[in-house]
Amino acid sequence: MSKEQLEAQHLYIWILHGVISLMFVAAIPMTYFAHMYKSPTSIYWQRTKPRGLVEKIDNIEEQESFGISKFGQFNWHDRLNFDACVECGRCTSVCPVNRAGGPLDPREIILSLKKRMMEGYTKTEEVLVPDVVSKESLLACTTCGACVEQCPSRIEIVTTIQQMRCSLALEEGQFAEGVAKTLQNI
């Protein structure tokens, strides 16, 4: 091959490489490869407070709602966590309730919330429990944090469950089995 042919071939290969690279970058948000930027973003913005910490409710008498009962109450950080899920199932495989045959599946909770978010269900009137997440699965969680430890995106599943349980307990008076008796005996 002559020098001119090699230079032309190099140019064509270089242009083809550029076009393929740009097509890949454009396809990232619509494919599984989106985890390349969603997971690091979720890890960067993870909360620095201890896991399982129940936050004090300031001005409790003036609060309109407690916890999260509607999708519109989730903040940007919660929605980022839903979007960062790579659907690997590690959270479910280490969940002691799931392993014992209980109703809790952390992966399904996050995926159902992610699905609602992607469908545009950000309306404040949509009730999460029992429409999106079952009450039994929320109340079955032991808040051990094994799911968060195993999650490659560091999604704070326990915090999400705690927020929804707070709404069940403080707004609707629904507790896990045995808790109501304990509270009555105090």
Regions found by a protein language model. Give the residues of each.
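Generic amphipathic alpha-helical segments used as scaffolds and interaction surfaces in large
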Residues: 10, 24-31, 79-82, 96-100, ...
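Short acidic (Asp/Glu) and glycine-rich catalytic loops that position anionic groups and cofactors
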Residues: 19-20, 88-92, 141-145, 161
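Hydrophobic alpha-helix feature that most strongly marks membrane-spanning transmembrane helices
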Residues: 45, 49, 90, 96, ...
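Flexible loop/turn segments at secondary-structure boundaries
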Residues: 36-37, 45, 93, 102-105, ...
